[in-house]
Each structure stands twice: as structure tokens, then as C-alpha cells.
UniProtKB/Swiss-Prot annotation:
It comes from the Bacteria. The gene is cysS. GO terms for molecular function: ATP binding; cysteine-tRNA ligase activity; zinc ion binding. Its EC number is 6.1.1.16. Keywords: Aminoacyl-tRNA synthetase, ATP-binding, Cytoplasm, Ligase, Metal-binding, Nucleotide-binding, Protein biosynthesis, Zinc. GO terms for cellular component: cytosol. Zn(2+) binds at residues 33, 229, 268, 272. Pfam families: tRNA-synt_1e (PF01406). It is an enzyme of class 6 (ligase). It comes from Brucella anthropi (strain ATCC 49188 / DSM 6882 / CCUG 24695 / JCM 21032 / LMG 3331 / NBRC 15819 / NCTC 12168 / Alc 37). This is Cysteine--tRNA ligase. It is found in: Cytoplasm. Gene3D superfamilies: Cysteine-tRNA ligase, C-terminal anti-codon recognition domain, HUPs.
Length: 505
């Protein structure tokens, strides 16, 4: 276990920043809600992937990679998938059409989030692989009296849950049943005992995918969205460590961290807690619940109707048009992906984020400067990160990525390549290919002496501070004649004047 300051994380459940103490330091466990694979992931979907990848890296650094399990699910059973399959493959058998939609969409998602610099989670369970666990949990909930069968559906009753000892329904959202009912889009159905009851299982219509049903229901059916995550987290984070439905030890039926976007607090995460806590008789499903904030695009809510709906693939294909065409398309995707990652990490994960083309371009410029220094000094990635103290300290304070990036800027300014490179690695911003390879277009436009250019830029900044504009302009013009274009700006952290440069022509 590496030394680190006490990790403190904001817990949505308690609305407090809490010291993180894993249930078992040898088996730290985290679950994050993943994609429903029916369409390309949009740029808002990228945010939780990046946020919890940084947390995954931090936990691995502190507790050891072999002691951390990160599960991110794949939802491959959903009405939206069915609709997309019917639209895109009308001539195929329905199950084959669904398979094509889910396989191709998942493959695209994996490629896109990898380009953003993310590690693969430890496990990525698919809903279709865990029907047995879902049926078993539903049977348990019916037996306990918090779920019931009606017209071949199985429904969970929040009011029945609140009549039992244990956690209250609504504790995560901090709302009463009446408040949740008033603010929710509730499916009205005659077979419900109460409007707030939600579906655990529903019958499949003819031609739709279906599986053997729980609770003695004779017709084929499929699960509701919420039970899928309860079952998959049980399968990957409880059962392998001695927990599950056969275990009556409450501590073995909890895990450490559950994450996702703020939009999932209600109803999805509220319903997960209800199902899991009732099934296992626990006070908590996960000890800490973390949620990232919303994303806007150029100051507006992202929406297809506004014409500002941007997928991750759109960003990778078109986000930095000034890069031109690269022979190595995969490397180009990764370069833009790292710029997108840096852009997102400049906003604290719990705050709303404003995605802009300008910030993406500025992040790419900053990466260019950082990698330029690492390339000049022949930085090599060590097996163990030992010079990441300031970055770890920042991230240990509720993933304060802005302060962590400020530490990287400080290391760059001091020409501390070890602190810069290792800190970039911990944040997922370091791709060794861009340090070592000779044929990277953004670095291979011309052979230039980086140190000499930086020295002349420093001299120019001195002239600017002295208000000697003629000499400052002379250096700028000389560099441009040599194929080096300067771009003036301000350090986002300090407000100091900065100058970046690029090789042109």
C-alpha cells in the first residue's frame, strides 16, 4: 500500500465529505453504471467514465492494483435497444437484430472511451449474462413481501419497504414518497398497487426477447433496468468475496463505492438501494455514493433539437480540425481523446461543466507543451510512481482534479519532468507513444530546438514586461520566419501571461 493522505470523498447519501475507509483494504470494490448499448455515447457519457477512471487509478495507487475491483456494467436489455434493432434491421430475425445493435454499439463505446485514456474496468458484466441472479433476487424480494406479482409483472413496493426496519426509500434523493411522486415521470398502470411501485420484471410481447420468469410466472419476460444493476453488483462485488443471497452477514453484502451521473440519483440509484438493502437485510448497499455533475455544450443544455448533440466519436473525428489527417488514425484519436480528458478534468467532478471547442483546443495546446518537454528530456515511464505527492494530495481531497492539474503546471514551469510525467500518468494523461514515437505529426513538422525556442520566448516575455514592444515583436517575427508561430494567453490558475508555440509551414 502506497503512502497517501487520507482519502476523503463526498457522499451523496450523507451530503458530507467523508474519510474513505474500505470495508476490506485487500479488496476495495467500486461499481459504476455503464452504457445502454443502443447508440453512440455522447460527450456527457464520457464524463463519469473519466471521473471514475481517475478514482480507479488513485485507489490502485494507494491500495495496489491487485486489491481493487472496478465493475462497470453494460446494459444490453432495454426497450430502446429493441426499437433501434427494429429500425435498423427490419429484415433480420429480431434477436439477431438486437445482437447486432448491442455488439456494434458496445464495440464503438469501448473504442471511444479507450481513446479518452481510460483503463479497462476490472470487469464489465452484461445484463444478459446475469438473468439467474436477477430472478433469484426477485424471488427473495417477493418472499419478503416488498415485491408482488400482478398480471405477469413483478413490482417493488416502496411503501412496503418503509414499513420494515432498515433504510427508508428516498434517503438518497432526500425526498418523501409524495415529493418523489410529484416530481417523477411515473408509469400509470392498473396492475400497480401504488403509483410509486416500480417494475422488477415484465412480460415480453410476441417477438420480443424473453427469458424464463421468476415468481412462478408462466410467460417469458425480461428485467427492469434497476434490478439489473443490483444483480450485477452482487455477482461481481459480493459473491466473489463471500457475500450474496446465501450469506447472512450484512458486512459481506455491502461494497465500498457506487458511482454515476447526478441524473441517476432518482429513480435508478434510489431503486437499486431499495432492492439490494431489502434482499440482503443491510443498512447500505454501498458505503459511499458519488455522482458527477451535468454537462452543457457552449453554455446550453445538450439536445438534438438544439443541434448541439455531440458524441464522443464526433469529438474524436472533428474536435481538432487543425490537426489535419494522420496516417495513424488510432494515434490521432488518442491525442484528441487526451485533450478532451484534460478539458474535462479542469472542472471539479461535482460541478456542472461547460464543454466548448475553445477549451478543447486550449487543452490540446497545453498537452503539446507538456509532451514537448517530456520528449526533449527523454522521459521514461517508471513502473512505480514515486513523484506524485502533490497530485495524490489533490485527488485525495474528493478528486480535486483542478488542483492536481495546477500541480502539473507547476512541475512544467519548473521543468520537473519526473513530477510532470508521473502526475500525468496518475491522471490518465500520459500515453508513452506520444513521448517515444518519432512520427507524431504534431511534433514532426520540423526539427526544432525546443530549449532554444523556450529561451527566446522567455526573453520576449521579459521585453513585454519591460514594455519594449519593438524587441518583443522582433523575436516573434524572427521565430515566425523560422516556422515557429507564437500564441499568447493567460495561465488559467495564476492569470500570468503565457506563450505557447507550434511549428507551421
Amino acid at each position: 500500500m502506497a503512502y497517501a493522505p487520507q482519502l476523503r470523498l463526498y457522499n451523496t447519501l450523507t451530503r458530507m465529505k467523508e474519510e474513505f475507509s474500505p470495508l476490506d483494504a485487500d479488496n476495495v470494490r467500486m461499481y459504476v453504471c455503464g452504457p445502454t448499448v443502443y447508440d453512440f455515447a455522447h460527450i456527457g457519457n464520457a464524463r463519469p467514465v473519466i471521473v471514475f477512471d481517475v478514482l480507479f487509478r488513485l485507489l490502485r495507487h494507494v491500495y495496489g492494483a491487485e486489491h481493487v475491483t472496478y465493475a462497470r456494467n453494460i446494459t444490453d436489455v432495454d426497450d430502446k435497444i429493441n426499437a433501434r434493432a427494429a429500425r435498423d434491421y427490419p429484415d433480420l430475425a429480431f434477436n439477431e437484430a438486437i445482437r447486432r445493435v448491442t455488439e456494434s454499439t458496445n464495440a464503438q463505446f469501448q473504442a471511444d472511451v479507450t481513446a479518452l485514456g481510460n483503463l479497462q474496468p476490472s470487469v464489465q458484466p452484461r445484463a444478459t449474462e446475469h438473468m439467474d441472479e436477477m430472478r433469484a433476487m426477485i424471488d427473495r424480494l417477493v418472499k419478503l413481501g416488498v415485491a408482488y406479482v400482478a398480471e405477469d409483472h413483478v413490482l417493488f413496493s416502496p411503501s412496503a419497504m418503509n414499513e420494515r426496519k432498515g433504510p427508508r426509500y428516498g434517503a438518497l434523493a432526500r425526498r418523501s414518497l409524495d415529493e418523489m411522486l410529484a416530481g417523477a415521470r411515473v408509469d400509470v398502470a392498473s396492475y400497480k398497487r401504488d403509483e410509486m411501485d416500480f417494475v422488477l420484471w415484465k412480460p415480453s410481447k410476441e417477438g420480443e426477447p424473453g427469458w424464463s420468469s421468476p415468481a412462478g410466472i408462466a410467460v417469458l419476460g425480461r428485467p427492469g433496468w434497476h434490478i439489473e444493476c443490483s444483480a450485477m453488483s452482487m455477482a461481481k462485488l459480493l459473491e466473489p468475496f463471500g457475500g450474496g443471497l446465501k450469506c447472512d452477514d450484512p458486512l459481506k453484502n455491502q461494497f465500498d463505492i457506487h458511482g454515476g451521473g447526478i441524473d441517476l440519483v432518482f429513480p435508478h440509484h434510489e431503486n437499486e438501494i431499495a432492492q439490494s438493502c431489502c434482499a440482503f437485510g443491510t443498512e447500505r448497499m454501498a458505503n459511499i455514493w458519488m455522482h458527477n455533475g451535468f454537462l452543457q455544450v457552449e453554455g446550453q443544455k445538450m439536445s438534438k433539437s438544439l443541434g448541439n448533440f455531440i458524441t464522443i466519436r464526433d469529438v474524436l473525428n472533428e474536435g481538432l480540425p487543425q490537426l489535419g489527417v494522420w496516417d495513424d488514425v488510432d494515434a490521432r484519436d488518442r491525442w484528441i481523446g487526451l485533450a478532451a480528458r484534460l478539458s474535462m478534468l479542469q472542472t471539479h467532478y461535482r460541478e456542472p461543466i461547460n464543454w466548448t471547442a475553445q477549451r478543447l483546443a486550449e487543452s490540446a495546446d497545453e498537452l503539446h507543451r507538456w509532451y514537448g518537454l517530456l520528449r526533449d528530456r527523454k522521459f521514461t515511464v517508471p513502473e512505480t510512481l514515486t513523484a506524485v505527492g502533490e497530485v495524490v494530495e489533490a485527488l485525495s481531497d474528493d478528486l480535486n482534479s483542478w488542483t492536481a492539474i495546477t500541480a502539473l503546471r507547476k512541475a512544467f514551469k519548473a521543468r520537473d519532468i519526473t513530477g510532470l510525467g508521473e502526475g500525468m500518468a496518475l491522471l490518465g494523461l500520459l500515453d508513452p507513444h506520444f513521448v517515444m514515437a518519432e512520427d507524431i505529426p504534431v511534433f514532426a513538422k520540423a526539427e526544432v530546438d525546443h530549449q532554444a525556442i523556450e529561451a527566446r520566448i522567455a526573453e520576449r516575455l521579459r521585453f513585454i514586461n519591460e514594455k519594449n514592444w519593438a524587441e518583443a515583436d522582433r523575436i516573434r517575427d524572427e521565430l515566425l520566419q523560422e516556422g515557429v508561430q507564437l500564441k499568447d494567453g493567460k495561465d488559467p490558475a495564476t492569470g500570468e501571461r503565457t506563450t505557447s508555440w507550434d511549428v507551421v509551414g
